[in-house]
């Protein structure tokens, strides 16, 4: 990197450390040319599994980041993974918060429900890779009930997208962990056997187990952002 770029990159870790009181490591730098910003994938020492985006203005060296929303999403993902595990469903999820307000909260120990309420999280998008090649009615029912319960606990609507993977499961999970945004193509190039979608709106699931199984499709790809329309 040239000197100015290096200074910009250094500004990210310095600024984040001052803001959150942790040390941070840049994993990847992007958008070097043609924009006023430099974007980086960053992890913290305290939560190395949470990869998030930070942007620095080349001129002013001002840094913005989405560390806290990724951290809160990670905690929701952990809870979902644990809850599904109780039904012997092995999974890993990527959680995206759709926030109305973006308060500059720096408390990394903040309660999940409180964070969602304060930031006006109406909806949460969940992408889940499931380590299985088929799903029966009981499993589909357990899955829907688990997501429904989580929606009630956090008082928020969910848009849920599931992928059945077998051979590529571990490498897909590693890609999901290393990529901050769900808009990144971490799902590309994997052998997805089936995909399915459902929503939780105001405490009601849009599909029951049978409907979910009937709607499973091996070809229903499409852009990840457009699949719930």
Regions inferred by a protein language model and the residue ranges of each:
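Extended amphipathic alpha-helical interaction segments
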Residues: 100-148, 152, 156-160
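A short, surface-exposed beta-strand/turn
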Residues: 50-73
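A short amphipathic beta-strand at an alpha->beta junction
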Residues: 151-175
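Extracytoplasmic/periplasmic, Sec-exported soluble proteins
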Residues: 4, 8, 68, 72, ...
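Exposed beta-strand-loop-beta-strand "reactive/processing" segments of non-cytosolic proteins
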Residues: 23-56
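Extracytoplasmic/luminal low-complexity segments enriched in Pro/Gly and acidic/polar residues
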Residues: 170-229
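Surface-exposed beta-loop interaction hotspot
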Residues: 65-125
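Short, non-transmembrane alpha-helical segments in secretory-pathway proteins
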Residues: 1-27, 76-86, 144
């Amino acid at each position: 990197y040239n000197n100015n770029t290096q200074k910009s990159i250094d500004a990210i870790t310095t600024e984040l450390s001052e803001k959150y009181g942790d040390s941070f490591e840049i994993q990847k730098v992007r958008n070097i040319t043609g924009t006023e910003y430099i974007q980086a994938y960053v992890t913290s020492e305290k939560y190395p599994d949470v990869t998030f985006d930070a942007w620095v203005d080349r001129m002013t060296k001002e840094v913005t980041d989405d560390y806290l929303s990724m951290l809160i999403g990670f905690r929701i993902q952990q809870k979902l993974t644990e809850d599904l595990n109780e039904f012997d469903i092995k999974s890993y999820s990527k959680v995206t918060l759709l926030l109305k307000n973006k308060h500059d909260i720096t408390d990394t120990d903040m309660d999940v429900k409180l964070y969602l309420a304060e930031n006006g999280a109406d909806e949460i998008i969940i992408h889940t890779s499931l380590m299985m090649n088929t799903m029966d009615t009981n499993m589909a029912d357990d899955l829907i009930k688990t997501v429904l319960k989580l929606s009630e606990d956090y008082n928020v609507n969910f848009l849920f997208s599931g992928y059945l993977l077998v051979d590529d499961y571990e490498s897909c999970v590693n890609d999901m962990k290393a990529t901050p945004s769900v808009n990144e193509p971490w799902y590309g190039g994997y052998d997805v056997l089936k995909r399915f979608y459902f929503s939780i709106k105001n405490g009601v699931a849009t599909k029951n187990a049978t409907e979910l199984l009937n709607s499973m499709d091996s070809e229903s790809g499409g852009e990840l952002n457009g699949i719930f329309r």
